[in-house]
Amino acid sequence: MIIPVRCFTCGKVIGDKYYEFKRRVEAGEDPEKVLDDLGLERYCCRRMLLSHVELIDDIMHYKVY
């Protein structure tokens, strides 16, 4: 849904890196190189960005009661 601000495992701040990661990967760069450039070396932080799925736009169509 919404990218978490911190890594669930180690607590490192990762929320500020998501849009840069997304932009560069969509431009055709290798995700491994992008994560290295962003300073995400721990596999727990890397999985947070690699496995994230944007669902907020789909969920907003439903009403909350």
From Swiss-Prot:
InterPro entries cross-referenced by the UniProt entry: RNA_pol_su_RPB10, RNA_pol_suN_Zn-BS, RPABC5/Rpb10
Positions with a binding annotation for Zn(2+): C7, C10, C44, C45
Transcription is among the record's keywords: yes
SUPFAM superfamilies: RNA polymerase subunit RPB10
EC number(s) stated in the UniProt entry for this protein: 2.7.7.6
Pfam short name (any one): RNA_pol_N
GO biological process: DNA-templated transcription
Location within or outside the cell: Cytoplasm
Keyword Zinc: yes
Gene3D superfamilies found in the cross-reference section: Homeodomain-like (1.10.10.60)
Domain of life: Archaea
Cofactor remark from the record: Binds 1 zinc ion.
Catalysis performed (reactions): RNA(n) + a ribonucleoside 5'-triphosphate = RNA(n+1) + diphosphate
One cellular component term from this protein's GO annotations in UniProt: cytoplasm
Keywords, in A-Z order: Cytoplasm, DNA-directed RNA polymerase, Metal-binding, Nucleotidyltransferase, Transcription, Transferase, Zinc
Quaternary structure annotation from Swiss-Prot or TrEMBL: Part of the RNA polymerase complex.
Function recorded in the entry: DNA-dependent RNA polymerase (RNAP) catalyzes the transcription of DNA into RNA using the four ribonucleoside triphosphates as substrates.
Protein name: DNA-directed RNA polymerase subunit Rpo10
Record organism: Pyrococcus horikoshii (strain ATCC 700860 / DSM 12428 / JCM 9974 / NBRC 100139 / OT-3)
